[in-house]
Amino acid sequence: MELEEQKKYFHGTLEITIFDATPFSPPFPFNCICTKPKAAYVTIKINKKKVAKTSSEYDRIWNQTFQILCAHPVTDTTITITLKTRCSVLGRFRISAEQILTSNSAVINGFFPLIADNGSTKRNLKLKCLMWFRPAYLEPGWCRALEEASFQGIRNASFPQRSNCRVVLYQDAHHKATFDPRVDDVPFNARNLWEDVYKAIESARHLVYIAGWALNPNLVLVRDNETEIPHAVGVTVGELLKRKSEEGVAVRVMLWNDETSLPMIKNKGVMRTNVERALAYFRNTNVVCRLCPRLHKKLPTAFAHHQKTITLDTRVTNSSTKEREIMSFLGGFDLCDGRYDTEEHSLFRTLGTEADFYQTSVAGAKLSRGGPREPWHDCHVSVVGGAAWDVLKNFEQRWTKQCNPSVLVNTSGIRNLVNLTGPTEENNRKWNVQVLRSIDHISATEMPRGLPVEKSVHDGYVAAIRKAERFIYIENQYFMGSCDHWESKNDKICSGCTNLIPVEIALKIAAKIRARERFAVYIVIPMWPEGPPESETVEEILHWTRETMSMMYQIIGEAIWEVGDKSHPRDYLNFFCLANREEKRDGEFEAVSSPHQKTHYWNAQRNRRFMVYVHSKLMIVDDTYILIGSANINQRSMDGCRDTEIAIGCYQTNTNNTNEIQAYRLSLWYEHTGGKITADDLSSSEPESLECVRGLRTIGEQMWEIYSGDKVVDMLGIHLVAYPISVTGDGAVEEVGDGCFPDTKTLVKGKRSKMFPPVLTT
C-alpha cells in the first residue's frame, strides 16, 4: 500500500536544515573596494511555490530548520533552494522528489555547489544543508498518539499546546427550548452562544477585547423571552460595551478596515462590513474602537483581518476566592447582521420579529419585498485556561502592531487575575488546546522562531488528517485547494490555490482503500458562496470548488480500480449542503411589494426555498480531535500572507464521563437531519461504516428531491441535502438535471471570471 503511494506521490514531511554558505569573498580586483558583505538569505520552493525563507544574515550562517508539508505528484515535483541577496540571485541547488525518494540514505546531507542562472556551476559558492523526508503513512494514528502522549501540537506555531483547559462548543447563535439532542439518554447541553457572550461581557471586571471582521453596535444578542437573563432582552452590543467601559472595564475593539469602503460617497465596500458605523457609534465614549486594514506588500485592499475573538476576564469557577481568569470566544461568528438564527433556520416565519433582515445572496432582496431571508448556520467555541491567554496574546500582538499599545491593560498588574495551568479536580478542564493562526509579521509582533509567516491553521488541518483512522467530518464556508492535482493545466498554474487539505483527504481515503479498511469523509458546504449566484466572484469560486471535487474523486476512483474493488467513490467521500423549504402558514409577514418576475428572487419566493448558509469552520476527526475557528478551507485563509485567521485544535485527555467531541458531532447531525440521526442509532457512533455513509446519503438525496421538486413540500426541519453533483464509478463528476442551482441560471460547476484575478477568489 505504502509503496504504491510512494510511486505516485511525494507525500509526507520534508525537513530541511539550512546551515551556512561559503563566506562572502569578492574576486580580484573588486576585493579592494567591495569589502562589506551583503545580507544573504535562502528560499525554498516546491516547483514555483515558495514554501520557506530564512532570515537575512551577513555572515551567511543560518542554522534554521523548516518542516515542509508535501503532497505532490512525484514525476512533476522539484525542490529548489536558492541563495539570494536583496538585489541578486547568487545561485541555486535543485533536487527532484524522485531523487529524494530513491536515495540510498534516509538523509541527504552535505555542502552543495550552487548553479548560476546560465547553468554554470559556481565551484567557490556552496551551501550546506540537510534534507530528511518522512512519508505520511508513518504518522501514528490519533488513538496511538494520544495513548503514548506523543502528540505535542503543531511545531511551527506561535503558541504551544496547553493542558488543563475548559472548552465549550457551540452551534448556531441560539436554540429553541425544544432542541434536545441526546447522547446515551443524557441530554447534550447545547448552550446558547449569544446569551453566554452577553453574560460573559456583563460579568467582566477588568477587560473586554474584541477582534472582528465586522461589528454592528445595534445588534441585539438576547431575543428569547424565555431566557435566563430577561433583563438582557433587547439590549444592544453597543449599549452593553459602553456600560462596561463606564464601569471602568477596558473595552478595546479592533475591526478590519475594508479599504474599499468609502463612507463619504456612501460606498459600503466590497465586503459590506459597515465598520464605520461602529467607529462612529463609539466615538467620544470610553470604548476604544480602531479600524485596522490588512496591510500587504502587494495588494493592500485585497485581503482581510478575518479573526473573530472576544477575550475577557471571568470568575474562577468552583472557587470561594475572588480570583479571576481569562476566557476567550472564537470561531465563525461576528457580532453583526444576519448571524442570529436557531436550529430551525426559517425562511419566511421570522421576518416580522427582528429589524435585521439579511439576504446578501439574492440580488435586490429587502424586507419590504419579503423573503426568503438567508438562514445562517455557524459554529463557535469558548476556552478557559492557558489557551485563552494565548488568544489574549494574539490580540495584544495585533493591537501593538497596528494601534497604540499604551491603551492595553497590563494584565500582570491585576492582582486577582490568575493563569491556572496546573491539574484541577474539574472534570471539564481535561482538554489539551493549541491556538493556531494564519498571520504574518506585517500584522503581528513576535512571530514564531523569527519566521515571517505563520500558517499553523493549515499545518493543523494536515496533521489531523494524516492521523485520521476512521472518519473526518467537515463543515466549512469554502472548500478548494491542492491545485497541483487539478485537471486543468491553466488552473494549476494561475490559481495559486496550493493548500494541501483536499488532496490530503483524498490520499488518506486512497490509502485506506488499498489497505481494504473502512474510512468515510463527510463535507458540508453552502450551495454557493455568499453573494448573488450570477456574480463573477461566486461563479469563479464554484469553478475552483468543482476542480477540487473532481480531483478528489479521481484519486479515489483510481484507488478503487487498482484494488479491483466493487465499491463506489461515494462510499468514502460525500459532499452535502444545507437547505430549507417551507409551506406557507397563517400569520406570516406580508410584503408590501413583490420581486420582479422571472428573477432569482421571484423564483425563490414563489417556490419557498433557499439554502441555509453554512459559515462554520470546523473539522472533527475520529470523534477524538476537533479544529474550529475562523479559517475557511481556501488559499486566502490558509496562506498566512493573505487573510489573518485564528483557530484552536483540541482534544480531551479524559473521556470517561462524556466524549464531548462525539456529542457535539451528534448534536450537529441531529440538527441537520431534524432528529433522524441520533445517538441511539448504532451507525451514528461508527461514522466510518458503510451503513452510516449510505444512511446519511439517502437522507441527503431524498431531501434534495423535495427541495428541487416542482411541488412546495415542507422539509420539516430536515436541512441536510446532497450537493447537486453525480459521481460515476470511476470518479468522474457529472451534472445533475440541467446543471443549475434551483431558481437560478447559475451552473453548479461555475466558470472562470474574466474580471477578477484568482488571488481574490481562491
Swiss-Prot record:
Chain segments annotated as coiled-coil in the UniProt record: none
Which tissues does the record link to its expression? Expressed in roots, leaves, stems, siliques,flowers and inflorescences.
Keyword set includes Lipid metabolism: yes
Localisation? Cell membrane
Residues noted as binding Ca(2+) in the record, renumbered to the chain: 172, 345, 377, 671
**Which ranges does the record mark as transmembrane?**
none
Active-site positions on this chain: 306, 308, 313, 615, 617, 622
Q: Which CDD domains match?
A: PLDc_pPLD_like_1, PLDc_pPLD_like_2
Q: What class of enzyme is it?
A: hydrolase
Database matches in InterPro entries: C2_dom, C2_domain_sf, PLipase_D/transphosphatidylase, PLipase_D_C, PLipase_D_fam, PLipase_D_pln
For this UniProt record, give its keywords in alphabetical order, as a comma-separated list: Calcium, Cell membrane, Hydrolase, Lipid degradation, Lipid metabolism, Membrane, Metal-binding, Repeat
One GO BP annotation of this record: root development
Task: Report the catalytic activity.
Answer: a 1,2-diacyl-sn-glycero-3-phosphocholine + H2O = a 1,2-diacyl-sn-glycero-3-phosphate + choline + H(+)
Where, by residue number, does a 1,2-diacyl-sn-glycero-3-phosphate bind? 306, 477, 615
- Domain-level remarks: C2 domain is a calcium-binding fold, and the binding promotes the protein association with membranes.
Per the similarity annotation, which family is this? Belongs to the phospholipase D family. C2-PLD subfamily.
The name under which this protein is listed is Phospholipase D alpha 4
